[in-house]
A protein has these predicted regions:
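Intrinsic-disorder-associated, low-complexity terminal segments enriched in Asp/Asn/His/Tyr and depleted
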Residues: 5, 12-15
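Serine residues within intrinsically disordered or low-complexity segments
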Residues: 8-10, 19-20
Length: 167
């Protein structure tokens, strides 16, 4: 495939490519889409189901087949896929606190001038981003899968990047 043109408008970029199938050449349009979502969790930690916002971005993009990358743009926040079940979220809280307890804050070398070393570790465990396939204009999830924003050092605005590529 060979790119022959590139133009951009608003949040969208269109890459036109040529491809040959059985001696015929056709031009296809590959779109990209970018949007930032902002969150301000009022507590130190929390989980937000952001699937509806991601689905809205997908509708906005017009992409029917492709991939979506969703990533936290802060080092004490996470984006992950799991079930939207409150008991599971409580289990995450307990498990993460056992792995990287907030207190005593003096146990961490990072805590010089701040007390969020545990939040960095929790983010590392839960992950930075997810990639989801788009099929027929929909997120191609398994049973019960949803996309979550995980906050581990809240009480301020943080961004999540949504980036899509497809046609």
């Amino acid at each position: 495939m060979k790119r022959i043109n590139r133009c951009s408008k608003s949040l969208y970029h269109h890459n036109y490519v040529t491809s040959s199938y059985g001696g015929k050449t056709r031009i296809r349009c590959m779109k990209t889409f970018r949007k930032e979502l902002w969150f301000n969790v009022p507590s130190r930690r929390g989980f937000i189901n952001i699937t509806p916002q991601i689905e809205e971005c997908l509708r906005e993009s017009g992409i029917r087949e492709g991939l979506i990358l969703v990533n936290a743009m802060h080092i004490t926040a996470s984006v992950f896929i799991n079930d939207d079940e409150s008991g599971l979220h409580q289990d995450f809280e307990v498990w993460l606190e056992k792995l990287a307890p907030h207190a005593p804050v003096a146990q961490y070398r990072h805590n010089v001038g701040e007390d969020n070393a545990d939040a960095h570790l929790k983010r590392q465990v839960m992950g930075r981003e997810v990639v989801v396939a788009v099929t027929d204009g929909k997120l191609d999830f398994g049973t019960w899968e949803q996309i979550f924003y995980g906050e581990f050092d809240g009480r301020r605005k943080k961004r999540v990047l949504v980036k899509m590529i497809g046609e």
